[in-house]
Amino acid sequence: MKNTSSIQAQFGAHLKKLRHQSGLSQEAFADKCGLDRTYVSGIERGVRNPTLEVLNVLAQGLEIEIKNLFEFK
């Protein structure tokens, strides 16, 4: 079984990649999602564990389906 922190780090790196592909700064993305920039930073660094509700907000902010947030290895 994978280490939870490892999965959080992988998810965060993937989210950061998706955000960059969308051409959004961390601050612009956080504003678009209605979240604090430091919270988004924590998710991207793998130190915050977002809820399902926040995952949905992140997907909407990136204008992607929520399942695309989990397409990382």
Language-model segments: residues:
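Alpha-helical residues within the helix-turn-helix
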Residues: 20, 31, 60
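Hydrophobic micro-packing sites on short alpha-helices
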Residues: 55-59, 69-70
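A short, Lys/Arg-rich alpha-helix, primarily the initiator
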Residues: 1-21
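Short, conserved catalytic or interaction motifs in soluble domains
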Residues: 45
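Residue-level signal for the short linker/turn that defines the boundary of a DNA-recognition helix
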Residues: 13, 23-24, 50-53
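Short alpha-helical DNA-recognition segment
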Residues: 23-42
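Residues within the helices of the helix-turn-helix
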Residues: 16, 27, 56
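Short C-terminal boundary/hinge segments that cap the last helix of small helical domains
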Residues: 63-73
